[in-house]
Structure formats: C-alpha cells, structure tokens
C-alpha cells in the first residue's frame, strides 16, 4: 500500500549548504522530519552544482515521517544575474538598465531551465526568460 502524504514543503536552499538552521530546520521540524537526514541527502544530491546557488526543492513528507524530495533548476532571475555579472536587478526596470545579456546566454538559460518550464519549444522558453530579464532591468542583445 502506498504511504499517506502528510505535507508538501517547498523551500529554496543553497546548493551543498543545507543545514538545520532556518529556513530548513523550522519548516521540516514542524513536520517531524529528521532534519539532518534531509540535509545530508540534499547536500549529496547537489554537490555537482555550484555551491551557494539557490535550488528550489519540493519535499514530500509522509505520515510515517519519512520523506522524498525533488530538486528543481535555479530560478531564472538568479541565472540571469550570474550571466550579466550583477548583484541585483533594477528597482525601476523601465528607466534604469543595470546590465546586458546576449541571446546566446538567454538560450543557454532556457535550455538549463527546460526541465522545469512548460514552454513547448526553446524559442518560447527564450521569450519567457527575456521577459524575466526585461523585468529585472537587463537588456537582451542579439
């Protein structure tokens, strides 16, 4: 018989840097999950990813306090900031442009995010990423 799902917990945790401090500890502690077991498993799964990159994770907690988790790709905004070499987006994206990204970089980000995005093809996903770039005050060249 399948296990009964108790809760879904969605978090963003830095790759390879999960530890019992907030936000991981309180979110999983409320569900009665072994926090250190999750931290070790998450860090092992994300060791190949650049350390410190925020990784969205969906943790499924079962009624017997066991869990499974699925990692997603980093948010598009984080990948765009990294590609443009900036710390943060523009506070006024329509007026202040804070950086530039090329179409090749946008395509690379779209291909990276392909597993998590619902776009039917790479061009549709690129348009979505370009929209995110524009809302951050980035100029897409090419």
UniProtKB/Swiss-Prot annotation:
Keywords: Methylation, Ribonucleoprotein, Ribosomal protein, RNA-binding, rRNA-binding
Example of a GO biological process term: translation
Pfam families attached to this UniProt entry: Ribosomal_L11, Ribosomal_L11_N
Entry GO MF terms: large ribosomal subunit rRNA binding; structural constituent of ribosome
Any single Gene Ontology cellular-component annotation: cytosolic large ribosomal subunit
Function field: Forms part of the ribosomal stalk which helps the ribosome interact with GTP-bound translation factors.
Subunit: Part of the ribosomal stalk of the 50S ribosomal subunit. Interacts with L10 and the large rRNA to form the base of the stalk. L10 forms an elongated spine to which L12 dimers bind in a sequential fashion forming a multimeric L10(L12)X complex.
Protein name as it appears in the record: Large ribosomal subunit protein uL11
Organism whose genome encodes this protein: Yersinia pestis
């Amino acid at each position: 018989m399948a296990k009964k799902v108790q809760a879904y917990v969605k978090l963003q945790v830095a790759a390879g840097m999960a530890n019992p401090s907030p936000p991981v500890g309180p979110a999983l502690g409320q569900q009665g999950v072994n926090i250190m077991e999750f931290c070790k498993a998450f860090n092992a799964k994300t060791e190949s990813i650049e350390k410190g990159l925020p990784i969205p994770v969906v943790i499924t907690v079962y009624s017997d306090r066991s869990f499974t988790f699925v990692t997603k790709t980093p948010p598009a905004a984080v990948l765009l900031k990294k590609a443009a070499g900036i710390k943060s987006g523009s506070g006024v994206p329509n007026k202040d442009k804070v950086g530039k990204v090329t179409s090749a970089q946008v395509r690379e980000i779209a291909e990276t995010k392909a597993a998590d995005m619902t776009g039917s093809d790479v061009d549709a996903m690129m348009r979505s990423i370009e929209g995110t770039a524009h809302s951050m005050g980035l100029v897409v060249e090419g």
